[in-house]
Amino acid sequence: MDNFFNQMVEIIKLNKTIGQIAIKAEFESEGTRMSELLRLKEIAHAAEIPMVVKIGGCEAIRDLLDCKDLKILNIVAPMIESRYASYKYVQALERVYGECSFKPKTYINIETQTGFNNLEEISDQISGFVDGIVMGRVDYVGSLNLRRDSVNSQRILEDSLKISSRCAEKNLEFVVGGGISADAVPFLIEINKVSLD
């Protein structure tokens, strides 16, 4: 193992002590290459932390096949905005993992105002088929024509709590994503308070 690899592993191990729970890669907007994903998978394995991969769309079969081959533990579909997109994601998961004994945890991203407005029908569609919903705050504030630093605002907190509440009703996990930094700690504490009540 090279020095950079070892440094990355040590940083992740340190981060785990303060709450890091996974390493994320994206085929979607980051355009992660397979060689990069393989290296990240090695680092994650050495640091004993799971991987999360955001695929390129609701029906990104090639991405799902790659995730299946690598036994990626968590998969997120981006920009889910309608019941139909949710349906296509569920169908794609069934097509790739239907006969497989290995099943990853699966999530959708609600990261636009349109997706938020269609939350009820989307959550109805995925309940029982997908594990949860991720609130993608950076793209969400962009869809509202707000600045990136609005991710921790009261408006976004209220919308996140609405998604969290709907997830609880439909027995889905709720995850806050996008713009996670030290500045997000008060926001996350508020989410946790309500989620644990």
How would you name each of these model-derived features?
Residues 1-197:
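Expand to "…catalyze enediolate/carbanion chemistry for C-C bond making/breaking, isomerization
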